[in-house]
Amino acid sequence: MKELAIVENDQVTGQGAWDFGAAAEHSLGDAALKTALLRATGKFDIGRQEIMAELPESELVREKARQIKDDVLAHLDTYLARFADSVAAAGGTVHWATTTDEANSIIAQIARERGVKRIVKSKSMVSEETHLNKSLLSEGFQVIETDLGEYILQIADDRPSHIVVPVVHKTKEQITDLFNRAFNKKLSPVPEELTAVARERLREEFCRADMGITGANFAAADTGTIVQVTNEGNGRLSTTWPPVHVVLMGIEKLIPRLADVPVFLKLLARSATGQPLTVYTNLITGPRGHSEGDGAHELHVVLVDNGRTAALESRYREVLRCIRCGACLNTCPVYQTVGGHAYGGVYPGPI
């Protein structure tokens, strides 16, 4: 079998030197991978179909969301300027990054200037795009992933294979074995046992963190509000416990108005995991106010281009509408068979 090697291209629309055929052949020989993929993607795909059937106007909502995103893409410069002004008016700071290296450098500089040592991260696909963890670790910072799936991958020295469920390629038995070796435990492959161990260890990390880094599902240009949806409490802890909160987001995540958020919330969880709404929906507008009891004292938003403006003027323009629900992965027979790693990029699948 061929040795698998990737030469990555940081541009969103670029093509790296990757042999999909060899990677797919490698994946096809992994019985545990096949079990994990079919179990998870089947569940999410069926869940999406069932819950969308409960929303009679689902196609109208999708069309409305498409119109909103098309408006943003047609006037992106205007909305970016409006968003930057709104964040500043709310007490936050906006930073502009053309490349992945610039984004990583900006975040490292913010951390150095504030004497940051420990950083907790909530799930962020853009941070995978920029290889942020590797960059920060090389600068001497301690970085801990706090999304359960990402935490498992960090312990395993692995990478995500799905944009919503990053550890979808591992079975609970494999995760149990990993935890037992990493933490010197004798756990059973019971989800409640595994999450209890992770919760206990991550709680300590939140208490000691000097900085929290998150992504953004959406960002409202008129108010500067960051919208973050999660099914775990890690997102809220990452944004409220550490004194410094850094948001790393692609420039395409903007929506015009805070009033547009419900349109996308009706779609995102339904399409991603078959839920009417995620467990947590966080709306963050600026740093902690004088009368507020929680929240970061500083809010920094790093807006990343990394090929997005080039995509805007290309045949790939439509990809910038993507809301990262992952439904295309869950329903794709190729992805269901070979998984995300076979594609060789940060964003796998058939979009």
Residue ranges and their predicted role:
Residues 81, 85-93, 112, 137, ...:
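Generic secondary-structure signature for well-ordered alpha-helical cores
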Residues 291-319, 329-330, 334-351:
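Ferredoxin-type iron-sulfur electron-transfer modules in oxidoreductases and energy-metabolism complexes
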